[in-house]
Amino acid sequence: MTVTGIVAEFNPFHNGHKYLLEQAQGIKVIAMSGNFMQRGEPAIVDKWTRAQMALENGADLVIELPFLVSVQSADYFASGAVSILARLGVDNLCFGTEEMLDYDRIGDIYVNKKEEMEAFLKKQSDSLSYPQKTQAMWQEFAGIAFSGQTPNHILGLAYTKAASQNGIRLNPIQRQGAGYHSSEKTEIFASATSLRKHQSDRFFVEKGMPNSDLFLNSPQVVWQDYFSLLKYQIMTHSDLTQIYQVNEEIANRIKSQIRYVETVDELVDKVATKRYTKARIRRLLTYILINAVESPIPNAIHVLGFTQKGQQHLKSVKKSVDIVTRIGSQTWDSLTQRADSVYQMGNANIAEQTWGRIPFHQSVSQSDL
């Protein structure tokens, strides 16, 4: 049977995600970000809730991406996630895209010209942001001309690179409805951005997602809920360059601005430059918030939930993969667990995120109905 992998954040889970799961074939394995997102922000609702949303709408198995895979630039995010999916026996990668590029051809180009392409990246001016360098690389070697500002394009190309190195087939699905960052109130296929922005509009949320009651009744957070803690971390840390990926230039810019801003958005606006994108600055601020340092990615895979079909698939791979289903005496990843502890501080009603939690079990798979 086909085992389809999907890399996701589900922040929050919406009708577009449900559509993607409906288009996917076979056993559907989701590699999902934990409580902090790829672009450097806390999830609006916690990872367990988002995993439940997915399992109630077609997913068979949801595993958690470690913190230092979740909160990364597109290439590292995709590479880390796809390598984990490959270990779980995934042979097909499904992802949404705004434009149906010839991803198979693009993957072949990368396989055949990987060294040249990586060398091209390294030669690009340091004044360019990483997305700008990546765009130039794809333009040079694959003739792809696009703005480079569409996250699903950038991620789609990153997935293509990662899948080509793991022998995984690609299954791009045309994205339905609103664009990735659209805040418009398109009711059927609203974007995650729009649902977060208009979360107080119950009618809109109910139209835009299949699990609206679960979402609306769950404790929610935004970046600003952590601003006081972030400010404390910045002002009291003796050397911010000890934090993961924070260099002296960025450390100085953050230190010099933190006293004069009242929101995370203001701080990001003050610190970001052409070279250091807002997404990169948010990731760095997330690292500072968590007090993250460079750490090895855990070999074990943490399971957030499954259907009966997903549980059977886990049993078929457990001899070759170290699986963690309960964190207690058995630890997993200390940095992810620290991130979970910080995440809980954003809302007193958030349930325990680590200790003693067991996978959510969806008794009936949507594909069996």
Swiss-Prot record:
Documented EC number(s): 6.3.4.-
Assigned GO CC terms: cytoplasm
Domain of life according to the entry: Bacteria
SUPFAM superfamilies (alphabetical): Nucleotidylyl transferase
Keywords annotated in UniProt: ATP-binding, Cytoplasm, Ligase, Nucleotide-binding, RNA-binding, tRNA processing, tRNA-binding
GO annotation (BP), single: tRNA modification
Coiled coil, from the record: none
MF annotations from Gene Ontology: ATP binding; ligase activity, forming carbon-nitrogen bonds; tRNA binding
Matching Gene3D superfamilies: HUPs
Keyword Zinc-finger attributed: no
Protein location: Cytoplasm
The keyword Transport belongs to this UniProt entry's keyword annotation: no
Pfam family, one: HIGH_NTase1
Primary localization: cytoplasm
Residues that coordinate or bind ATP: 7-20, 96, 152, 175
Reaction(s) this enzyme catalyzes, per UniProt: cytidine(34) in elongator tRNA(Met) + acetate + ATP = N(4)-acetylcytidine(34) in elongator tRNA(Met) + AMP + diphosphate
Sequence similarity: Belongs to the TmcAL family.
Function: Catalyzes the formation of N(4)-acetylcytidine (ac(4)C) at the wobble position of elongator tRNA(Met), using acetate and ATP as substrates. First activates an acetate ion to form acetyladenylate (Ac-AMP) and then transfers the acetyl group to tRNA to form ac(4)C34.
Protein name stated in the entry: tRNA(Met) cytidine acetate ligase
Organism expressing this protein natively: Streptococcus agalactiae serotype III (strain NEM316)
